[in-house]
């Protein structure tokens, strides 16, 4: 009898139509017609059990979620992640854009966009990330930055059975891929797809070709003077906007540039990630450089251009507008420079 009641309770909870059968079975006990037909409690219980089993077998199993991260590693989740730790500001932005902001339980210092990210618990900073802080957040998914998250930390998390997705976008298209992947992993594939499509559409609208392509120096540091070499997302943005990024073939990612090399490169445009134009005072008195002589120095939103996330489309739009302006000014001020000589 207990087994029969348990079957009915389980059945009516998960399969509503069993409730009706159960009521019918109860009524049958008081009717002689059922007795005449020879239905016993055991027979009905077995029938109900068979129906439950058949329906449970028929229920579709939830499909595994499988993606390949930017390091070429396959990541498989049995179910969408519910507790996510993001170890880079751009990954926090990705998560919010892909609909997973509410599932973030830990982020890295400097994660300030959108505004809701400022209220999330910190598990570390660019100076270091404590394994204990990440683990204590009880994540079922960690979003790591390929070149920014220590490899040792990634291996330790994986050894503990915590899935790690590593983001390392080197091309603009990789950012859209990250948005789609995070949407899938967090159970928001539609939101991830929408975010990726918005990003791709914005890039398509801003893309331009300039003939000749202006020579662009991206100033990263001032003392010493440094830039970013090829393979960095900023150089991709410059190319996307029709410019020629100088020193893109340097053998290191952050090359130090001497004055002689810069004079030989003759940059026609200088851009830097800065909140204002104060950095441009550094170039006063260097009119031997075409960019300084023509005044084609531009400031870019530092967060938008340095974080390979959804707001990079905004930085690309700004960069493209600046390079188009520079090309027009160069063409009108100096025919030789306008021709890229």
Predicted regions and their residues:
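Extracytoplasmic substrate-binding proteins
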Residues: 64-67, 73-74, 140-141, 145, ...
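A short, structured surface patch at a secondary-structure boundary
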Residues: 82-137, 141-147, 246
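Short helices/loops that flank or line small-molecule/ion binding pockets
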Residues: 131-138, 160, 256-266
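Bacterial N-terminal signal peptides
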Residues: 43-58
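Short helix-initiation/N-cap motifs at beta->coil->alpha
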Residues: 70-72, 123-132, 148, 250-259
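Alpha-helical, coiled-coil/dimerization segments enriched in small aliphatic residues
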Residues: 110-113, 227-253
């Amino acid at each position: 009898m207990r087994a029969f009641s348990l079957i009915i309770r389980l059945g009516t909870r998960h399969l509503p139509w069993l409730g009706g059968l159960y009521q019918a079975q109860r009524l049958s006990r008081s009717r002689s017609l059922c007795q005449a037909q020879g239905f016993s409690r055991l027979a009905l219980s077995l029938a109900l059990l068979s129906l439950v089993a058949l329906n449970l077998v028929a229920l579709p199993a939830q499909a595994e979620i499988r993606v390949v991260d930017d390091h070429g590693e396959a990541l498989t989740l049995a179910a969408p992640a519910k507790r996510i730790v993001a170890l880079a500001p751009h990954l926090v932005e990705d998560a919010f854009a892909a609909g997973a902001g509410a599932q973030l339980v830990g982020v890295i210092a400097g994660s300030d966009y959108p505004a809701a990210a400022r209220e999330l618990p910190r598990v570390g900073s660019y100076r270091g990330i404590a394994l204990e802080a990440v683990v204590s957040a009880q994540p079922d998914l960690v979003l790591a930055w390929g070149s920014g998250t220590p490899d040792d930390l990634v291996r330790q998390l994986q050894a503990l059975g915590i899935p790690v997705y590593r983001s390392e976008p080197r091309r603009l298209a990789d950012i859209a891929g990250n948005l789609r992947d995070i949407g899938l992993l967090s159970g928001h594939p539609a939101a991830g797809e929408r975010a990726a499509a918005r990003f791709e559409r914005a890039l398509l609208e801003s893309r331009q070709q300039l003939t000749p392509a202006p020579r662009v120096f991206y100033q990263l540091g001032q003392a010493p003077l440094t830039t970013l070499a090829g393979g960095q997302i900023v150089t991709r943005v410059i190319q996307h906007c029709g410019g020629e990024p100088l020193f893109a073939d340097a053998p290191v990612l952050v090359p130090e540039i001497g004055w002689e090399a810069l004079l030989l490169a003759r940059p026609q445009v200088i851009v830097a990630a800065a909140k204002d134009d104060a950095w441009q005072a550094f170039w006063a008195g260097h009119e031997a450089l075409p960019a300084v002589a023509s005044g084609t120095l531009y400031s870019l939103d530092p967060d938008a251009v340095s974080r390979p996330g959804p707001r990079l489309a905004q930085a690309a739009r700004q960069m493209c507008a600046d390079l188009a302006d520079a090309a027009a000014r160069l063409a009108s001020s100096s025919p030789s420079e306008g021709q890229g000589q």
